[in-house]
């Protein structure tokens, strides 16, 4: 009787062990799952605030500086992570832009074709004083079509030659840069150059000023 009991216990234990060997892999194997964590990043744009511009030299108030324009420049740095880039526009707060008071001023530059920049700066006529600007983007391809040149004319071609394509400042925004991709973290240094010339226009002594505003907007 005892032998039968021991045999039965042994058989049961063997069956249990065999069952464990069969089922153990299912118990020990791992199962896994994953999730995707998403964080949105919005587009932003910044523009620097450069110091005010002092032109390269004073202009004699009676004889003027015909044939020897005075020059100045400023650089606005634009940074954006916007995938489609930005546009930058320029405008003046007054007409004419460069003024001393209600009587004495520099006329806004007068290009040969209205609203189209002159490839070369046009000398001021007798008794005339003028103020104008041009733009030199950090990336030539970003130059607005109006300020691109083909080596002899503006609003044409794909170049942006230095010290070319001069235009009058306007109280209406004029697009000077059009970039279609984001910038680097360092941004794009956009140079705006200014010139003044007087051909014996009588100008009262003083510091004439023009307030020029640059606006950068995401595309």
List PLM regions with ranges:
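Signature of Gram-negative chaperone-usher
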Residues: 26-219
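C-terminal segment of classical bacterial N-terminal signal peptides
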Residues: 15-27
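Positively charged n-region of N-terminal signal peptides that target proteins for export
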Residues: 1-5
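Internal alpha-helical transmembrane segments of multi-pass membrane proteins, especially GPCRs
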Residues: 7-10
